[in-house]
Design a protein with these regions (language model features):
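Short glycine-enriched, charge-decorated loop/helix-capping segments at active-site entrances
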Residues: 47-48, 166-167, 267-273, 340-345
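Hydrophobic, well-ordered secondary-structure elements that form the walls
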Residues: 256, 297, 317, 325, ...
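Terminal RNA-binding accessory module
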Residues: 340-431
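Active-site proximal loops enriched in glycine and acidic residues that flank catalytic Cys/His/Asp
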Residues: 196, 230, 258-260, 296-300, ...
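Radical SAM enzyme [4Fe-4S]-AdoMet core and its adjacent flexible, acidic
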Residues: 10, 203-218, 222, 269, ...
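Conserved SAM/AdoMet-binding glycine-rich loop
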Residues: 73, 81, 86, 186-307, ...
Length: 431
């Protein structure tokens, strides 16, 4: 039987979809050439916002409409967060929670044997859940591989449903991580990105931490670059930063989640830092990693955010000088503490604030790219498109080099950055 996997959401979901893909292939299933008519369609969902849920439902309806006789497997964060609702979703033949993805093949075989709808969404424990044994050995045709090392979150930000969808923090053992990284390196991947739901909590309750994971990744022969996924700022203490800075393979690019640049809003969000602490951590990272890039997420229009609060957030974002900012309006999430907070902002006002913050983010991006012009940087080329090579520097600046050929894809070359253009830098080969 053939299959197709549709993935919504974060890099962790992408990793888990790849793990399920490899599991299916290993057990005799094969990728569908006609994805709209696959015998089995796995939908790996995201539920970070209500907009995400709407996308999930729209995709389920489309798949069932296009392929009325196919088997639909629903998994990911949406069924885990809302098991009661999902059990009533009759369009799906198999529904698996986040803890059950490693049981995908047995679930499909059970369904085929009995042709009876299967729903398996066990809840999480307050503590004591084991890390799910998912692994990958490749990541399609990409030049970088995402490697999940952590799952779950203990933070319970007031706007966020993810702790309910992912459970408490648990971590991949270092021995398992080393084996997985060795297999990925054998597959020719020269860059890996370590990802997790709350990545900087890796090793919580264990005798290892994020620095140990980075040191393990950097020790693997064949892997030349190691990146970190999104990290929470307050867990980046000086000792951790010092250990990270000792690893030459670690790329100086940090996605340091902010959410708001206003202390009052951060407190209402139940974030675990204030703007002073955040700025200090950014300063420590920049001191340890010269020419590093800082990227972030900023939410506008959170419940109770006044115009004064918004302006404070704008001023702080400008002060930090991010390389890139993902701006998004607050979306009320059923089942979170923020649902009952007073002072919800109108959609029109959230849109206005998102536009203003977006303009600030665009200017910050332009300033960062311009700051890279004149530098000679190592670029890992990923593809040849429209007559130019595309790749990234270690600090994740996108670079376009006119000319060259596809033989350079997957190779690292020194490039002199000559101009900032749009969302990238132009450059010429330096050697």
């Amino acid at each position: 039987m053939d299959f197709n996997i549709l993935t919504l959401g974060c890099k962790v979901n992408q990793y888990e979809s790849q793990a399920m893909r490899e599991d299916l292939l290993k057990n005799g299933y094969f990728l569908s050439e006609n994805k709209d008519k696959a015998d089995i369609t796995v939908i790996n969902t995201c539920t970070v916002t209500s907009v995400s849920d709407a996308k999930n439902r729209k995709l389920i309806h489309r798949v069932r409409r296009q392929n009325p006789d196919g088997i639909i497997v629903l998994t990911g964060c949406m069924p885990q967060a809302f098991p009661g609702e999902m059990k009533e979703l009759k369009e799906c033949d198999i529904i698996l929670g986040n803890k059950e993805r490693s049981k995908l093949v047995p679930a499909i075989e059970a369904f085929l044997a009995h042709r009876s709808r299967l729903v398996d969404i066990p809840g999480y424990l307050n503590r004591g859940d084991m890390y799910e044994n998912l692994t990958v050995s490749s990541f399609g045709e990409h030049t970088r591989a995402f490697i999940k090392i952590e799952d779950g979150c203990n933070r319970f930000c007031s706007y966020c449903i993810i702790p309910y969808a992912r459970g408490r923090v648990r971590s991949k053992p270092l021995s398992a991580l080393k084996t997985e990284l060795e297999n990925v390196a054998l597959g020719g991947y020269r860059e890996v990105v370590l990802v997790g739901i709350n990545l900087s909590a890796y090793g919580s309750g264990e005798d290892y931490d994020l620095a140990d994971a980075v040191e393990t990744a950097c020790s693997i022969e064949g892997i030349e670059r190691v990146r970190l996924g999104s990290i929470e700022p307050e867990q980046m203490d000086k000792e951790l930063i010092s250990r990270l800075a000792a690893q030459e393979k670690l790329c100086p690019q940090f996605h340091l989640s902010l959410q708001s640049g206003c202390d009052k809003t951060l407190k209402a969000m139940n974030r675990h830092y204030d703007t002073r602490e955040y700025a200090e951590i950014v300063g420590n990272l920049r001191a340890a990693f010269p020419n590093s890039s800082m990227t972030t997420d900023v939410m506008v229009g959170f419940a109770g955010e006044s115009e004064e609060d918004f302006q404070a957030s704008m001023a702080f974002v400008k002060q930090i000088g991010f390389a890139k900012v993902h701006v998004f309006p607050y979306s009320l999430r059923k089942g979170t503490r923020a649902e009952s907070l007073p002072g919800h902002v109108s959609p029109a006002e959230k849109e206005r604030r998102a536009k203003l913050m977006g303009e600030l983010a665009d200017n910050s991006r332009k300033e960062f790219l311009q700051s890279q012009v004149g530098l000679i940087e190592e670029v890992l080329f990923e593809r040849l498109r429209h007559g130019y090579l595309e790749g990234y520097t270690k600090n994740y600046t996108p670079v376009h080099v006119t000319g060259g050929d596809s033989s350079l894809c997957g190779e690292v070359r020194r490039v002199r950055l000559t101009a900032a253009a749009g969302d990238y830098c132009e450059g010429v080969l330096s050697d």
